[in-house]
């Protein structure tokens, strides 16, 4: 099933229904077309088929030469996510900065200087947007923090959120046979 994600939703070969952010939305996430950020260049590719001028999401494209077993593994938690959790929950700004810098350096980005003023929560939000794109983790980050508005996938602005929008309805198969 996971192997169909790319071909059903993200491949540049689709005519209709392709899921892709606008160039402006993508640049709002990555702040620039950064060739140094390893989360940008391999996953966001501008197709050479002449069909689209925007970048398409290739994170779930099956590698041509790889063991299919490893292609479909999804980690329960990533080491980067653990560093983000520490950065978010610690009261020690130096520890938070150290955790963020460790991930940033390993993603090809410049570390924050010790004297640089950094809004840890804002940086965390930006890092979540880059690190977990297409995985659903960002939704749960927003839900956990009860964020009242989230960026729309297009250039239309923000989507207002409330408790009801953060809850998914239970499928009938989960409720049909309950007492």
Task: Please state what every model-predicted region is.
Residues 1-20, 33-179:
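Acidic/polar-rich alpha-helix caps and helix-coil junctions
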Residues 25-34:
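Aromatic (Trp/Tyr/Phe) and Gly/Pro-enriched flexible surface segments
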């Amino acid at each position: 099933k996971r192997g169909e994600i790319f071909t059903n939703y993200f491949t540049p070969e689709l005519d209709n229904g392709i899921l892709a952010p606008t160039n402006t939305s993508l640049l709002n996430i990555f702040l620039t077309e950064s060739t140094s950020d390893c989360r940008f260049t391999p996953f966001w590719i501008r197709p050479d088929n002449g069909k689209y001028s925007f970048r398409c999401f290739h994170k779930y494209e099956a590698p041509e030469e790889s063991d299919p077993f490893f292609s479909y593994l999804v980690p329960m938690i990533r080491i980067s996510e653990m560093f983000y959790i520490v950065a978010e929950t610690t009261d020690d700004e130096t520890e938070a900065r150290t955790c963020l810098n460790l991930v940033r350096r390993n993603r090809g980005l410049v570390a924050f200087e010790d004297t640089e003023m950094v809004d840890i929560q804002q940086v965390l939000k930006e890092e979540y947007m880059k690190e977990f794109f297409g995985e659903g983790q960002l939704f749960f980050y927003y839900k956990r923090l009860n964020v009242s508005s989230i960026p729309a996938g297009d250039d239309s602005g923000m989507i207002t959120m409330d408790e009801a929008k953060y809850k998914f309805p239970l499928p009938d198969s989960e409720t049909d046979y309950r007492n």
